[in-house]
């Protein structure tokens, strides 16, 4: 019994250390290296500003369309602009914590405390806008449970979080950061494809 205990104790310690390293909300699988994923995640998480331009495709119940995407992020301020999807014309979502506004061409300007409530009320989409801040960088949102699959390069390949499935189909390096260039999101009767043509990452807090 003593020999068995001596053999099992270090194994159990290693298992617990590995689970703690991943964080309480994160389950990781896939061919990548967990330590390399943690290093990549920590590096990309230092980005608190960016400018993105590209294309977006949206499939919703009984409607679909595509358009262009522009996203300016400056720490806790965001300015997300869509033009063309679903025949709505230009749509602009801007704000900071607890103060968000949505402008829809031909309909006016609307305000709410959260981007999720505003988008659902005015566009009818249950879209986790706050999670997109993380997902667009190839990271899980830290405030809820997630199941991750990392690829052979130890980058996020697939994410399941809060009823959404996110697939990362292409990456590229920009200013020393490996960032997603093609993302497919599916959940709550929505399917969204993002194709990022231009990434300009920034570390504003440093």
From Swiss-Prot:
Keywords for the protein's UniProt record, in alphabetical order: Cell outer membrane, Chaperone, Lipoprotein, Membrane, Palmitate, Protein transport, Signal, Transport
Subcellular locations according to the entry: Cell outer membrane
Swiss-Prot/TrEMBL GO biological process terms: lipoprotein localization to outer membrane; protein transport
Lipidation (N-palmitoyl cysteine): 19
Signal peptide annotation: 1-18
Pfam families assigned to the protein according to its UniProt record, in alphabetical order: LolB (PF03550)
Keyword Glycoprotein belongs to the record: no
Lipid attachment site numbers (S-diacylglycerol cysteine): 19
Entry's Gene Ontology cellular component terms: cell outer membrane
Gene3D superfamilies, sorted: Lipoprotein localisation LolA/LolB/LppX
Keyword match Signal: yes
Membrane topology listed for this record: Lipid-anchor
InterPro entries reported in the protein's UniProt record: LolA/LolB/LppX, OM_lipoprot_LolB
Quaternary context: Monomer.
Function per UniProt: Plays a critical role in the incorporation of lipoproteins in the outer membrane after they are released by the LolA protein.
Family per similarity comment: Belongs to the LolB family.
Protein name: Outer-membrane lipoprotein LolB
Organism of provenance: Stutzerimonas stutzeri (strain A1501) (Pseudomonas stutzeri)
Gene: lolB
């Amino acid at each position: 019994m003593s020999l068995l205990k001596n053999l099992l104790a270090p194994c159990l310690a290693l298992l617990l250390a590995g689970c703690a390293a991943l964080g309480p909300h994160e389950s990781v699988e896939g061919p990548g290296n967990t330590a390399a994923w943690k290093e990549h995640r920590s590096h990309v998480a230092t980005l608190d500003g960016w400018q993105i331009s590209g294309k977006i495709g949206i499939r919703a119940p009984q409607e679909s369309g595509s358009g262009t995407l522009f996203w300016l992020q400056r720490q806790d301020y965001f300015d997300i602009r869509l033009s063309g999807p679903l025949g709505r014309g230009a749509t602009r979502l801007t704000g900071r914590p607890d103060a968000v506004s949505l402008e829809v061409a031909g309909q006016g300007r609307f305000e709410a405390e959260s981007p999720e409530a505003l988008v659902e009320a005015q566009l009818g989409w249950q879209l986790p806008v706050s999670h997109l801040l993380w997902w667009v960088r190839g990271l899980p949102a830290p405030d809820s449970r997630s199941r991750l699959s990392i690829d052979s390069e130890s980058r996020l390949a697939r994410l399941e979080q809060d009823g959404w499935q996110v697939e990362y189909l292409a990456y590229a390096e920009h200013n020393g950061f490996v960032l997603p260039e093609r993302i497919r999101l599916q959940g709550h009767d929505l399917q969204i494809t993002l194709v990022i043509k231009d990434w300009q990452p920034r570390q504003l807090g440093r």
